[in-house]
Amino acid sequence: MAAAIRIRAVAAGARLSVLNCGLGITTRGLCSQPVSVKERIDNKRHAALLGGGQRRIDAQHKRGKLTARERISLLLDPGSFMESDMFVEHRCADFGMAADKNKFPGDSVVTGRGRINGRLVYVFSQDFTVFGGSLSGAHAQKICKIMDQAITVGAPVIGLNDSGGARIQEGVESLAGYADIFLRNVTASGVIPQISLIMGPCAGGAVYSPALTDFTFMVKDTSYLFITGPEVVKSVTNEDVTQEQLGGAKTHTTVSGVAHRAFDNDVDALCNLREFFNFLPLSSQDPAPIRECHDPSDRLVPELDTVVPLESSKAYNMLDIIHAVIDEREFFEIMPSYAKNIVVGFARMNGRTVGIVGNQPNVASGCLDINSSVKGARFVRFCDAFNIPLITFVDVPGFLPGTAQEYGGIIRHGAKLLYAFAEATVPKITVITRKAYGGAYDVMSSKHLLGDTNYAWPTAEIAVMGAKGAVEIIFKGHQDVEAAQAEYVEKFANPFPAAVRGFVDDIIQPSSTRARICCDLEVLASKKVHRPWRKHANIPL
């Protein structure tokens, strides 16, 4: 495996050397120098391609990790990478850092631009073989330069993070470098997509840049995100915790929600990142790419007519509905292991990218809670920022009750999802498959939050609450509870009261859902919304 990786590294290095030649520098008149300018350039370039040297490259491979340049080679289209600042070196003179042995062309990060499936992207890849990928002033300067360029031309930024943190020898200059990067992250937010792929350690101040980007992915077993490491935690709180427990991929994809997905290894992560990139527009001013679609837009889906159980309390898998409706069952789920009671992700309808949001009856009956509300809100806001239409599948019995939720701030966090849907001006299509109870009905992209098209299936139950709870209030003391429940269901727990009032646009046959959505998306493609001017909104953070 290591040998194969080395071969790829050499090949990648050769391609990079070719791409970076043609600088137009002449050596005429310099023959008296011991080493010509051209030879010096070649030597510097060769040193840059080797990073921290073969010994450190081998150590990187033994950890099951690719080098910074190998990662770029796998991520980008062959021959498309145009490197910048290959000759930049750190400026630190303290602690022996001025010695030639501590100078590496390019320092500890590789930066530049390239293409993924022919589409422009800017990339930085931290090089753990050089000072552990630690961030120096020069390192930060290189990253900031490509981020500025990406904002200027309107292209995404992908960061491949593998760094031990700030370079201690540089002191405050390293901290200033982090702040410079954070500022670019904020400036670029909502302008260009920003993606972080954590492929090694990422600790201390370094963690805030991935946290500010739109999506954070991790590699299992080799990547870590934490503000303070296990040793500091032990000294301060007396907790014994491993790196993996504290900030590993499992922790951040299942417990904290900091990371959006985790992949098995570097190769798997980079291949998935290429696929994910295909769903995204280059900027907020550009449409998402359109893929040729061989899945008929008017395709009927007969299995949807029986997917919702007749028993209102029986669970089913919302993913079965999503996969059946979208193009070729291709769904890139975001945060699949976190807050599983809501499903979010990207798909295509008739070749065009859409954002999917759906309650998951298989988990907590699809109730909204703190984590699912925050997960859904962040996804909805990303889609709105980058003009990606939203399709929402609703089966929600309400917000999860209990002191843990109330003490945790479910009111404030639940309001985030409501706010996100209300704020969104992209095309919004909602399908109520079964339950839509109480305030959760309002929150899930209802007509009242300016949903463009709102459908209900015949199995929909749109009401203030479920029949049992309602009967206990309305028919308190009533002798025939079953009759009372039947009366409530007849009057309220069905799609007709909402349809009569225009709160749903139509009650549709489930099998026609794909055809109806594709047709609506075509009509809504020219949608324009004008809102009152404001400096910025104040979402309940």
UniProtKB/Swiss-Prot annotation:
Transit peptide recorded as keyword: yes
Where is it predominantly found?
A: mitochondrion
For the CoA carboxyltransferase N-terminal domain, which residue ranges apply?
A: 34-292
E.C. code? 6.4.1.3
Which InterPro entries is this protein grouped with? AccD/PCCB, AcCoA_carboxyl_beta, ClpP/crotonase-like_dom_sf, COA_CT_C, COA_CT_N
**In which tissues or organs does this protein occur?**
Broadly expressed. Most abundantly expressed in the kidney, liver, small intestine and stomach.
In what residue span(s) does the CoA carboxyltransferase C-terminal domain sit? 296-535
Which GO cellular component term is one of those annotated?
A: mitochondrial matrix
PTM-bearing positions, type N6-succinyllysine: 101, 250, 476, 491
Give the matching Pfam families.
Answer: Carboxyl_trans (PF01039)
For the region Carboxyltransferase, what residue ranges are annotated? 34-535
**Quaternary structure (record):** The holoenzyme is a dodecamer composed of 6 PCCA/alpha subunits and 6 PCCB/beta subunits.
Q: Which family does it belong to?
A: Belongs to the AccD/PCCB family.
Kindly provide the name given to this protein in its UniProt entry: Propionyl-CoA carboxylase beta chain, mitochondrial
Q: Which organism is it from?
A: Mus musculus (Mouse)
